[in-house]
From Swiss-Prot:
Pathway: Carbohydrate degradation; glycolysis; pyruvate from D-glyceraldehyde 3-phosphate: step 3/5. SUPFAM superfamilies: 2,3-Bisphosphoglycerate-independent phosphoglycerate mutase, substrate-binding domain, Alkaline phosphatase-like. Belongs to the BPG-independent phosphoglycerate mutase family. It catalyses: (2R)-2-phosphoglycerate = (2R)-3-phosphoglycerate. Its cofactor is Mn(2+). This is 2,3-bisphosphoglycerate-independent phosphoglycerate mutase. The active site is at S64 (phosphoserine intermediate). InterPro entries: Alkaline_phosphatase_core_sf, BPG-indep_PGM_N, Metalloenzyme, PGAM_B_sf, Pgm_bpd_ind. It comes from Shewanella halifaxensis (strain HAW-EB4). Binds 2 manganese ions per subunit. Its EC number is 5.4.2.12. The keyword Manganese applies. PANTHER family: 2,3-BISPHOSPHOGLYCERATE-INDEPENDENT PHOSPHOGLYCERATE MUTASE.
Length: 514
């Protein structure tokens, strides 16, 4: 007979920060009776999910990938942004053998170096400083044909903020004496992660064939035309920029294609379209034989050169639970499924022994403000069922609403998103109480608590650096001040009466009173 387990659940409310300022603060304005009651009744605190507390540069807003890696590993993990920026500052970037080989092979073949990535100072998926370093390195090594394919942000940055960056790169290429911005497209198309291949195909055609919905003579002209069409950065339609002689720029055999995004989840689909022989997401008119470089490893099954391979994280929470014969469930919607599995497990794709996974499909809508509750009801149905089954020691669940709806900049929809999650939490807490379980409620980073950019008056669609809540729904206890995301795994193990592995440098911040 199966032993009844009293689960410890970790509920991660994605994009749910705490902000003193209540103006356009969807978390504050939402009617959240369940969380209000839990906060009044149970120990709670605010913890940090940004900057140096999660291995990012000081003051850098947190994000879902970084948050889940820190939570799952129980230690501060120095992020790719920090690691690559440091390599550039130290001069090590210019000696990276993978990057050098790609550039030099292209030069030898009289071929071009194509650089693509999210041209943004956002620091979530990429950083434009890294892209600049790549352009400079290519020219320094003697490349005569250097082409930049710019994916535009407007999601981790204000909705219309791409123009200064594009102008900067046009000036940079003038200074370098060679190179140009060859194409523009919004990240909505190039960086889809939900198998919407009709979007990705537009970016693929633009880069491989030079085919765009629009043409422009310069990047600045291209972005100005997009704004005239009322397209924000994220949604800029594919725009080809021919060279000075009017020739279409396209990816050809022997060219290097260097992808400068360091975050994996939104880099995988487009990468597979370039390098997988058996790719079937859409029909490719051409498949040039290129040297493709990923800045970091996007997935174990993508066979391409990696400039900065990841270092292994051992004894993460998932691995520790496996080693102690404890059972665990990971559950979320499509949008955050990779976060509660791959990222939470420190970049490991395979589930651990005793780890079950439930994926609930996110709704197929253009943007989530059209359905702010997303699939939260179905997710909660499955989660309640899992709790009542009493077969799991630990349950990790992510509700994407605060983040995914927060990114749309739609305040009213973000309020509805928070309200939907609140009612779900009520059902979960009730189910846990029935089986003698407990839960920690927290967030990976802020977003929905700031829906307007006070300096510009534009919608605020990015994450924030605000602290995030932590509520312990369980025994009589106190939560220490000054916690951070990396303290959650050690805290959970301690609550379960388990020893914390030495690799976890976070600390247990909940002291039981009994």
């Amino acid at each position: 007979m199966m032993t009844r387990k009293r689960p410890l659940a970790l509920l991660i409310l994605d994009g749910w920060g705490y902000r003193e300022n209540t103006q356009k603060n969807a978390v504050f304005h939402a009617n959240t009776p369940v969380l209000d009651q839990l906060t009044a009744k149970y120990p709670n605190s605010l913890i940090s999910g940004s900057g140096i507390d999660v291995g990012l540069p000081d003051g850098q807003m947190g994000n879902s990938e970084v948050g889940h890696i820190n939570i799952g590993s129980g230690r501060i993990v120095y992020q790719e942004l920090t690691r690559i920026s440091k390599a550039i500052d130290d001069g090590e970037f210019d000696t990276n053998p993978t990057l050098i080989k790609a550039i030099d092979d292209a030069i030898k073949a009289d071929a071009a170096v194509h650089i693509m990535g999210l041209l943004s100072p956002g620091g979530v998926h990429s950083h434009q400083d890294h892209i600049e370093a790549m352009c400079r390195l290519s020219v320094k090594r003697g490349a005569k044909k250097v082409y930049l394919h710019a994916f535009l942000d407007g999601r981790d940055t204000p909705p219309r903020s791409a123009k200064p960056g594009l102008a900067h790169f046009e000036e940079l290429f003038k200074t370098l004496g060679t190179g140009q911005v060859a194409s523009l497209i919004g990240r909505y198309y190039a960086m889809d992660r939900d198998n919407r291949w009709d979007r990705v195909s537009q970016a693929y055609e633009l880069i491989t064939e030079g085919k765009g919905l629009h043409q422009a003579t310069s990047a600045v002209e291209g972005i100005e035309a997009a704004y005239t069409r009322d397209e924000n950065d994220e949604f800029v339609g594919s725009t080809a920029i021919p060279d000075a002689q009017g020739n279409i720029i396209k990816l050809e055999d022997n060219d290097a294609l260097i992808f400068m995004n360091f975050r994996a989840d939104r880099a995988r689909q487009i990468t597979r379209s370039f390098i997988n022989a058996d790719f079937d997401g859409f029909k490719r008119a051409v498949t040039p034989k290129i040297n493709f470089v990923m800045l970091t490893e996007y997935a174990a099954d993508i066979k391409a050169a990696i400039a900065y391979p990841s270092s292994d994280l051992v004894n993460t929470l998932g691995e520790t639970l496996q080693n102690r014969d404890l059972t665990q469930l990971r559950i979320s919607e499509t949008e955050k499924y990779a976060h509660v599995t791959f990222f939470f497990n420190g970049g490991k794709e395979e589930p651990f022994k005793g780890e079950d996974r439930i994926l609930v499909q996110s709704p197929k809508v253009a943007t989530y403000d059209l359905q702010p509750e997303m699939s939260s009801v179905e997710l909660t149905d499955k989660l309640v069922e899992a709790i009542e089954s009493t077969q799991y020691d630990v349950i990790i669940c992510n509700y994407p609403n605060g983040d995914m709806v927060g990114h749309t900049g739609n305040f009213d929809a973000a309020v509805k998103a928070c309200e939907a999650v609140d009612s779900c939490i009520g059902r979960i807490v009730e189910a846990l109480e029935k089986v003698g379980g407990e839960c920690l409620i927290t967030a990976d980073h802020g977003n929905a608590e700031q829906m307007t950019d006070e300096s510009t008056g534009q919608a605020h669609t990015a994450h924030t650096s605000e602290l995030v809540p932590l509520i312990y729904v369980g025994r009589d206890a106190e939560i220490e001040k000054g916690g951070r995301l990396s303290d959650l795994a050690p805290t959970m193990l301690t609550l379960m009466g388990q020893e914390v592995p030495a690799e976890m440098t976070g600390r247990s911040i909940i002291q039981l009173k009994e």
